[in-house]
């Protein structure tokens, strides 16, 4: 567990993320997905149940809003990332500097024609060269992988396919307007393997309010042996079929605490299967949450929350396995992880003290001169034998 804590901390927290998130503006490759908000008035009007424009706005006004919502220029993100990279590199000059291992391309790049896809990939590949990143991971819908050749993507720098499964449970897929099933997903996984590319998975958590059903999705994910796991929250946007269901009372959303508890179980299950590259994205349509949000849990610091919970579980088990009752203990660790160990407002330590009837838990910074303590995530629990008043 200690090793997995170190790895998830490096992958999810310390490491900066280069994420290029293309908005999804069409149902192409996503069938008739209930959670999609589509930037295509003509296409939308041909799909049953989607022709009503909200708030009685005129078509011209609606198109104007949609257009502004979906504007995305990859060069803007590249410029921002380059500036961040150069500034941080300058600050850490002379040190062992490493920014990230991978670039993530998420969302709707696959909805463009091939020429546009390759043009966008060329820009990102050039950026990757400048910042010294060798791995580029591209998210693709299941139907895209099944219907198109993906081998050519390797020529454009893509080494990993993030398969946008949405879910791995047939019932969840069916209820959300997707025509493919788990059988088709396994075919897509096999096709990626035949292309000699790494395979990762992205999925939306919370499409079902049945926790057992959600956890079965993760069990199936483990069987597919993904390199990475991209987890998105089920955020309901205005103008979607799920929005109609929610308004009518036919869609139940998980509470904040239910979401956190389920995510904790999902992360724990993933770590046990040695899936340590876990990326959290707010929504499949993250670009337009601000303007079109209706309901759903949105976290600004879910990575930190999950790592904090992982440390609590580790410390809890560590003390339990010591089989020594003591009212005072000392936790030695690098100062950089003190916050994760303590939890928000010392919540982790307070719970430990209450459960084990302790009076005091001291936090001591690990001696950096100790060669065995080079890892920034080193953690040691010491039983204090001295008597205290």
Language-model-detected regions and their locations in the chain:
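Auxiliary Fe-S-binding modules of radical SAM enzymes
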Residues: 1-20, 34, 92, 97-99, ...
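N-terminal [4Fe-4S]-dependent radical SAM core
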Residues: 1-99, 104, 130-132
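Core AdoMet radical
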Residues: 44, 65-81, 85-88, 97-114, ...
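Short, electropositive alpha-helical surface patch
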Residues: 121-123, 211-227, 285-304
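Alpha-helix-loop-beta-strand connector modules within alpha/beta enzyme cores
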Residues: 121-130, 184-200, 258-269
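Acidic (Asp/Glu)-rich catalytic clusters
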Residues: 152-157, 194
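Conserved strand-turn element in the central/C-terminal portion of the radical SAM core barrel
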Residues: 188-213, 217, 232-238, 246-256, ...
């Amino acid at each position: 567990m200690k090793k997995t804590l170190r790895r998830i901390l490096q992958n999810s927290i310390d490491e900066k993320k280069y994420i290029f998130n293309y908005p999804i503006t069409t149902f192409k490759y996503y069938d008739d997905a209930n959670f999609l908000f589509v930037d295509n008035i003509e296409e939308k009007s041909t799909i049953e149940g989607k022709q009503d424009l909200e708030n009685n706005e005129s078509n011209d006004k609606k198109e104007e809003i949609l257009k502004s919502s979906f504007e995305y220029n990859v060069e803007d993100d590249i410029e921002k990332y380059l500036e961040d990279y150069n500034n941080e590199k300058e600050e850490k000059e002379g040190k062992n500097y490493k920014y990230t291992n991978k670039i993530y391309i998420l969302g709707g790049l696959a909805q463009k024609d091939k020429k546009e896809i390759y043009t966008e990939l060329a820009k990102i590949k050039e950026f990757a060269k400048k910042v010294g990143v060798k791995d580029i991971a591209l998210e693709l819908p299941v139907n895209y992988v099944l219907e198109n050749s993906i081998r050519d993507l390797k020529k454009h720098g893509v080494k990993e396919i993030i398969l946008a499964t949405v879910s791995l449970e047939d019932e969840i897929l069916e209820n959300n307007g997707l025509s493919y099933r788990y059988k088709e997903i396994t075919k897509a996984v096999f096709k990626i393997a035949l292309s000699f590319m790494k395979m990762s998975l992205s999925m939306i958590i919370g499409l079902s309010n049945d926790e057992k059903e959600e956890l079965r999705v993760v069990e199936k994910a483990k069987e597919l042996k993904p390199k990475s796991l991209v987890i998105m929250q089920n955020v309901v946007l205005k103008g979607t079929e799920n929005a109609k269901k929610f308004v009518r009372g036919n869609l139940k959303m998980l509470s904040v605490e239910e979401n956190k508890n389920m995510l904790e179980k999902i992360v724990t299950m993933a770590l046990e299967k040695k899936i340590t590259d876990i990326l959290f994205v707010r929504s499949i349509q993250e670009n337009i949450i601000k303007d079109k949000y209706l309901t759903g849990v949105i976290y600004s610091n879910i990575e930190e929350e999950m790592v904090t919970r992982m440390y609590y579980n580790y410390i809890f088990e560590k003390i339990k396995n010591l089989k020594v009752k003591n009212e005072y203990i000392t936790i030695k660790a690098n100062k950089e992880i003190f916050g994760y160990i303590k939890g928000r407002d010392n919540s982790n330590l307070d719970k430990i003290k209450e459960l084990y009837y302790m009076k005091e838990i001291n936090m001591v910074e690990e001696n950096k001169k100790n060669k065995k303590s080079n890892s920034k995530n080193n953690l040691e629990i010491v039983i204090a034998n001295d008597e205290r008043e």
